[in-house]
């Protein structure tokens, strides 16, 4: 921890707790990547409100968007108190600017080629100039870590600031045993995957990063795994994959990818999964939930995704149900909740793979008891808002799905004029879609009262669709 650059400002508040310390913590950048990974598009600084001196941040280059392979920028810091963030745009003038998600309500000030905004709590933000979403600035303002593991503890794997290569050169991974805490100090850069295979009681913590691994973190045949705070930059495949595991918690994770098959968080035959406060910008599905795939078997249930930001440069922000087990034909995806989610982008030119909120079941899967609530869709470049389908996809499936039922969409808003019609389609009379509730749906500021206004293409084998104007408790 002594390698972190810590800048502290102490101030007094008239409170019974006495003195409160406000801090800004920035991380060293390893010399091996200092020049190679820098992006000169922006100069970013931060300071405590009321202070004179600014703290310079390192501007990382991150690749985004498989179609364009664009260079975007990322900065990170930890803080408490209230801080100002100053951004200088180094290439061209500022004609307009926006800080997203819009739900955060951050209104920046613009002065020439400078932009200023203030935050008083942790945030994951996109700063976009002149409508440019591909060469934008990502600002990750983390909470300060209070309980750092003891590096001398035999059950702690501690990665200090610097570049770390795995000793497993064949698999290019760091294998984590049971009952272990892995800590990535700020400024730690791992050039390999973290693998949790057939283990239990593992914690992966800290504000370090995984840089261009084959995949980010793999959790297979395991239980009770916590991932909190890390950043995964441009993995070749998944950011986090889960297979036949239970008790997975993911918090404050940040992810970028730009290649095909580089999904964000994918879970196959997993249960009891909690995802909270993540930022995923991926060039494949941001979050995908399946049952059987490869060597993983069983249902997918009790999944919660909360308070997060999803940005699908390619494919779906949310995709449920594609892969399953036609041999047994009895696997289920159920008791799934997505709540308080900002979707910043959905762009997919293939109609079969469109949908911000997609339940597309194949392989004899049944999807039921799924809720999407408080979802804000800011932009759809090409795609659909809703996609509910029972399908036999010849490319990925060995049989059709069994059905989709008991699905609730509540408090959904979307802005965008040129969006493809949403789709609801069953397969046959025994493999249908039923009992779908749309409650308080707002498109471009207008509250929806009918399927026609909702712009849904309702096809065969669909039953019991309801549209409610106002919230009513179940």
Outline where the language-model segments fall:
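Short glycine/acidic-rich loop motifs that flank beta-strands on beta-rich extracellular proteins
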Residues: 167-171, 191-195, 212-217, 235-242, ...
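Extracellular beta-strand-rich solenoid/capping regions of secreted or surface-exposed proteins
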Residues: 117-119, 164-181, 189-205, 211-225, ...
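Hydrophobic h-region of N-terminal signal peptides that target proteins for export
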Residues: 11-21
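Beta-strand-enriched, solvent-exposed domains that form extended recognition/catalytic surfaces
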Residues: 23-149
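C-terminal structural cap/anchor segments
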Residues: 357, 362-422
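Sec-dependent signal peptide recognition
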Residues: 2-10
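Right-handed parallel beta-helix
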Residues: 179-181, 186, 200-210, 223-234, ...
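Conserved small/polar residues in nucleotide/adenosyl-binding loops
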Residues: 471-474
